[in-house]
Amino acid sequence: MRGVALLVAALTVVAPARAQRPLISTNPETPFKLATFEAAGKTRVGLVLGQRILDIEGAHTAVVQELALRGTPAMPRDMRTLVEDYDRIAPHLYRIANRFRDASADNPAFAFNVERVGILAPIKYPYNLLAIAANYKLHAGEMFPPGSPPQKAALDADQDKENPVFFAKSPRSCIIDPNEPYVMPPGRNIDWEGELAIVIGKPALNVTEATAHDYVFGYSIMYDVSDRGGSGRPLTGMFPGPNWFSGKSRDKAAPFGPFIVPKEFAPNPPHFHIVTKVNGTVKQDGNTANWIWNEAHMVRYLSSILTLYPGDVISSGTPDGVGAGRKPPEFLKPGDVVTIEIEGIGTLRTPMKAAQ
């Protein structure tokens, strides 16, 4: 027995040590954005790190093989599924970001230059696309005659004393991709409205303001294309006042993207600087810190009326500086290019195109 023990000890000493695989953190240490993109004829879900965009399926497979991991979930092939399953797959996305954060380290086949792929609307398509009206006092004020009772009411608006007004856009009919031209309806007055888009992360019904942020997934950019050309109804007729459907819900009237920033990499509260330009000229320059109804109020109010689902989008209102509020009014024409820049998210670009 003593000889056997000595032999085992000797083999233990001379046996080569098994190589230690590197440990890669599954904590959110490397900020990233998410995108839906097209490359090599395939639509993919991407993780954006600076100027690189990683196909999450390919990146996940590479990390699993490198670390010899077992029992890891498959990566989703569309953004809405990713949002629905985020709690389960987030650690694996964090691991991917931490592994590939050094762009100079390698250039795998699943990594692309973000400028050389087709960036699509991040979610095609949410169940609900809901937009708030007049959520900035200065914008609300610019839409009414100076000194008028409606303008005074707008400038005095208080989220604790009244509820907001929302309208719906059809996700399937309205959402278009970044850089996709908006085909202008003939004879209409098309305006610019740059907005922060809030993406819902969990089913939300009758939530409180205290818990509302728990139901948010992240943030993107929405262009609330607005038709000011005769969308109102006669004050003496049936249902007087603005016709929100014709003014806000025209075909392709919701350019969306380019990226989603998960909330763990965004400011809380979500105070973002928004700049809207037409042909490079600044038209709107605002900050979501100036909302009348804040994120918690919007989510609480909407969820008191209907269920919000993962991937649903709330377009949170536009700052002052729209064309209809200028003296004289200004509207877009074919050939114009609208860009909406939100710090920390990106730039949404929409060219205007004449109808054929």
Feature-to-residue mapping (PLM):
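Bacterial N-terminal signal peptides
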Residues: 4-13
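Generic structural signal for buried aliphatic residues
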Residues: 196, 314-315, 338
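Active-site microenvironments in enzyme catalytic cores
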Residues: 20-39, 61-62, 68-282, 297, ...
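Charged, cofactor-coupling segments
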Residues: 21-27, 32, 38-44, 48-62, ...
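Sec/Tat signal peptide C-region and signal peptidase I cleavage site
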Residues: 15-19
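Residue-level recognition of short, solvent-exposed, well-ordered loop/turn junctions
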Residues: 124, 131, 309, 333-334
